[in-house]
Amino acid sequence: MAKVDLFNQNGEKVGDLQLADSVFGVEVNTYAMHQVVKALLANKRQGTQSAKTRAEVSGGGIKPWRQKGTGRARQGSIRAPQWIHGGIVFAPKPRDYRMSIPKSMKKVAIKSALTSKVNENLMVVVDEIKLETPKTKEVVKMLNAFNAKKTLIITNNAEENVYKSARNIEGVQIIPVNNINVYDVLKYDKVIITKDAVSKIEEVYA
């Protein structure tokens, strides 16, 4: 089992923590991570874009001028794509971009993403993150203690005071462990996670 340092929210080491190899020490599967991220982004797309082709634009049923003798280029319809207000070539139509990913691949992907952060020393485990009142400067102080800028903070529960304190910090996102996903883990340079959240992840994904 991999051993990592356990810190308090002030950046002071308070002990060690053993991480389950079945979650934080797996072989990194880049293909699974790519597929899951691609599906997450695709599923966010609305797919409502639409434009009219020349067959759908109104008007243009009559030839604008005779074929020969005018000195102008021949034209068949004022709704051809080269005309203003003409139809669109290969016009986009509403479509469903959703992709389905097997649960087993999602598991492999999240474990691979977490393992990659551990391997690169980009995951910091803290015993807890507690704030009596919402104070952004306290979260900034914690981030500075770990030299963290673009950071994902994962807690076991949605701590309201911590959430309110972190939500306005640029480049920082805080999520409860139940909402963990591959995209967020990979998107942020560093992950700060509580000890309880680690236990929850091991319970679900081991």
UniProtKB/Swiss-Prot annotation:
InterPro entries: Ribosomal_uL4, Ribosomal_uL4-like, Ribosomal_uL4_dom_sf. GO terms for cellular component: ribonucleoprotein complex; ribosome. Gene3D superfamilies: 3.40.1370.10. GO terms for biological process: translation. One of its GO terms (molecular function) is rRNA binding. Pfam families: Ribosomal_L4. Keywords: Ribonucleoprotein, Ribosomal protein, RNA-binding, rRNA-binding. PANTHER family: 50S RIBOSOMAL PROTEIN L4, LARGE RIBOSOMAL SUBUNIT PROTEIN UL4M. One of the primary rRNA binding proteins, this protein initially binds near the 5'-end of the 23S rRNA. It is important during the early stages of 50S assembly. It makes multiple contacts with different domains of the 23S rRNA in the assembled 50S subunit and ribosome. Forms part of the polypeptide exit tunnel. Belongs to the universal ribosomal protein uL4 family. Part of the 50S ribosomal subunit. This is Large ribosomal subunit protein uL4. It comes from Clostridium botulinum (strain Loch Maree / Type A3). The lineage of its organism: Bacteria, Bacillati, Bacillota, Clostridia, Eubacteriales.
